[in-house]
Amino acid sequence: MDIHQYKIMLVDDNHDLSEMIAGILRQSGYENIVTAGSVAEALDVFHRELPDMALLDVMLPDGDGFRLFQKLREKSQIPILFLSAKDEDRDRLFGLGLGADDYITKPFLPPELVLRIS
């Protein structure tokens, strides 16, 4: 699939960070970015937009990204990556153990993010 058509769902409650990440992705050719700031909003966006990939923050205002991952995984096998400031090995290993495709800790370098989602 051409990356211009690839739809990425970005879930993070920090609006400024979401906009920055979306900008990085758009500059790299990923033009179709949809965002959500909570678990509830992410589930709605997921059902409405049917993304090809999801990037999930671990800490969200109405739940955590791990539970969201499990709900999304029940419905789809799209690639799902965690983006989190929680950099403890146990969190990273837990996320990967659930079946996440990657666990990227914040802060990250923009080229690293693009490389790891491609």
PLM regions and their residue ranges:
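Short amphipathic alpha-helix used as the core "switch/output" element in two-component signaling
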Residues: 44, 66-76
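Acidic catalytic/metal-coordinating carboxylates
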Residues: 38, 64-67
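The feature encodes the CheY-like receiver
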Residues: 61, 88, 106
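Two-component/phosphorelay signaling modules centered on CheY-like receiver
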Residues: 15-34
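Active-site residues of response regulator receiver
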Residues: 57, 84
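Acidic, metal-coordinating helix/loop segments flanking the phosphotransfer/catalytic sites
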Residues: 35-53
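Conserved acidic carboxylate
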Residues: 12, 60
